């Protein structure tokens, strides 16, 4: 409408100028009877000026304003391939959900000091928010497009390729994956398997209509890992199981805060989780919190920072502290509520406190060099080594595990025939509020 309104104004101006020109020409015609030749020349000059003014007005009318070039992409592609830095060229990413602390400790610092500390942490927060935006956009696509009949390899690689594209780090050059990309391998744990399962090369497993699949993946910018997970099902019979776990995770987020004891969070989570039950094939199962799985704090380039957030009552009296980052995750099961290591290992990470030992196997030495340059202390899986062109590395990898340099993380499973679910968010304990970095419209 604005362009149309400008045209109408130009027409009115042009008509006004033409009208004035006609009146002036008529007046000049009356005066010519008594005027000499020099006056005729002046009339012609005035008429020429009026015509020139009219022509200029016409040209002005025709001249269209130049359209400003739009900088950067305005929306995400499908599948996601546009780096989020192009969607947010000012590098200001959306805040997560802001949650007030339940019982603010006024003695800690003044409100003004807290606000100052928040401003000082801006770069730190922007890196987390960028990773969170990557996670939200990738999982939005995944939730819409993952269907029964797809292989787990296809699903995992689709998610991982999207994360690498949106962070702008493909991870194929030395050091690139340490700057940004996958925070840890995409976990796709099915049914009784609760965590740490991703397909190795050659895996032919296919997602089935009746499966309960936990999708757990991380995106990082400069080692700021956003760890978030959700559960996918294709049968409403599992709805209560998913609701129980989702509500338990939200309870953990609500209870978390500066100076809060881990044990208190675990008790609140368990109370909510185990208030649910689910009916499957005519049998009613109580939903049990998996007592030997926990949430955890996150350090830079380190997914498990040393503190654990239990999901059952009792135990750890450790407190959360200001400035810490936590992955609040809960797991519910229709089985025993206890997991054991099972199936083929796929997840690995170099130990933070890796011992300086002499390695005899050249394959182990070479592989450690690859791990140091491409992952550091970030978790990786066998497919990532394949992607970097490594082959015949299993002997060397097992040697690094035996030496305590690399930690293996086998899949964790409840009893066969049971179903498990997971929901997880990353939160930052800011001085003034807690920010649920990974929160989205989906969960």
Curated annotation (Swiss-Prot):
The keyword Repressor appears for this protein: no
Enzyme Commission number(s) from the entry: 3.4.11.18
This protein's GO CC annotations: cytoplasm
Signal peptide per UniProt: none
One annotated GO molecular function: metalloaminopeptidase activity
Region of interest called Disordered, as start-end residue ranges on this chain: 1-90
Cofactor note text: Binds 2 divalent metal cations per subunit. Has a high-affinity and a low affinity metal-binding site. The true nature of the physiological cofactor is under debate. The enzyme is active with cobalt, zinc, manganese or divalent iron ions. Most likely, methionine aminopeptidases function as mononuclear Fe(2+)-metalloproteases under physiological conditions, and the catalytically relevant metal-binding site has been assigned to the histidine-containing high-affinity site.
Compartments (UniProt record): Cytoplasm
Sites where the protein binds substrate: 196, 304
Comp. bias regions, Acidic residues: 33-48
Recorded coiled-coil stretches: none
Biased composition range(s): Basic residues: 58-73
Catalytic reactions of this protein: Release of N-terminal amino acids, preferentially methionine, from peptides and arylamides
UniProt key word Cell membrane: no
Keywords: Aminopeptidase, Cytoplasm, Hydrolase, Metal-binding, Protease
Gene3D superfamilies per UniProt: Creatinase/methionine aminopeptidase superfamily (3.90.230.10), Winged helix-like DNA-binding domain superfamily/Winged helix DNA-binding domain (1.10.10.10)
HAMAP family listed in its UniProt record: MetAP_2_euk
Function: Cotranslationally removes the N-terminal methionine from nascent proteins. The N-terminal methionine is often cleaved when the second residue in the primary sequence is small and uncharged (Met-Ala-, Cys, Gly, Pro, Ser, Thr, or Val).
Record protein name field: Methionine aminopeptidase 2-1
Organism name: Talaromyces stipitatus (strain ATCC 10500 / CBS 375.48 / QM 6759 / NRRL 1006)
Organism placement in taxonomy: Eukaryota, Fungi, Dikarya, Ascomycota, Pezizomycotina
């Amino acid at each position: 409408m604005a362009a149309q309104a400008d045209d109408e104004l130009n027409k009115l101006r042009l008509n006004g100028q033409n009208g004035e020109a006609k009146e002036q020409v008529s007046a000049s015609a009356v005066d010519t009877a008594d005027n000499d030749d020099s006056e005729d020349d002046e009339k012609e000059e005035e008429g020429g000026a009026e015509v020139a003014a009219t022509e200029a007005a016409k040209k002005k009318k025709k001249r269209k304003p130049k359209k400003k070039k739009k900088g950067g992409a305005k929306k995400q592609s499908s599948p996601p391939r546009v780096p989020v830095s192009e969607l947010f060229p000012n590098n200001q990413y959306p805040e997560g959900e802001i949650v007030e602390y339940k019982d603010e400790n006024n003695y800690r610092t003044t409100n003004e000091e807290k606000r100052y500390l928040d401003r000082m942490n801006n770069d730190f927060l922007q890196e987390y928010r960028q990773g969170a935006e990557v996670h939200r956009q990738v999982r939005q696509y995944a939730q819409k497009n993952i269907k029964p009949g797809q292989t787990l390899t296809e699903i995992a690689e689709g998610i991982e390729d999207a994360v690498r594209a949106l962070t702008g780090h493909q991870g194929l050059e030395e050091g690139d994956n340490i700057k940004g990309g996958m925070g840890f391998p995409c976990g796709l744990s099915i049914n009784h398997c609760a965590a740490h399962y991703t397909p190795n090369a050659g895996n032919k497993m296919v997602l089935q209509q009746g499966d309960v699949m936990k999708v757990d993946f991380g995106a990082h910018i400069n080692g700021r890992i956003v760890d978030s997970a959700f559960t996918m099902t294709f049968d409403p019979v599992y709805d209560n199981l998913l609701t129980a776990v989702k509500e338990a995770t939200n309870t953990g987020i609500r209870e978390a805060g500066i100076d809060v004891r881990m044990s208190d969070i675990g008790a609140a989570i368990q109370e909510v989780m185990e208030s649910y039950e689910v009916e499957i094939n005519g049998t009613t199962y109580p939903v049990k919190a998996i007592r030997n799985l926990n949430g955890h704090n996150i350090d830079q380039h380190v997914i498990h920072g040393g503190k654990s957030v239990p999901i059952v009552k009792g135990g750890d009296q450790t407190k959360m502290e200001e400035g810490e980052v936590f992955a609040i995750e809960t797991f519910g099961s229709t089985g025993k509520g206890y997991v054991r290591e099972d199936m083929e290992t796929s997840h690995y990470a170099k130990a933070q406190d890796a011992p300086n030992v002499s390695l005899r196997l050249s394959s182990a030495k070479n592989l450690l060099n690859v791990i140091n340059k491409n992952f550091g202390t970030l978790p990786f899986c066998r497919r990532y080594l394949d992607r970097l062109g490594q082959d015949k590395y299993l002997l060397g990898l097992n040697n690094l595990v035996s030496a305590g340099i690399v930690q293996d993380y086998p899949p964790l499973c409840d009893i066969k025939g049971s179903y498990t679910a997971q929901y997880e968010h990353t939160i930052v304990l800011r001085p003034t509020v807690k920010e649920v970095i990974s929160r989205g419209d989906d969960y």
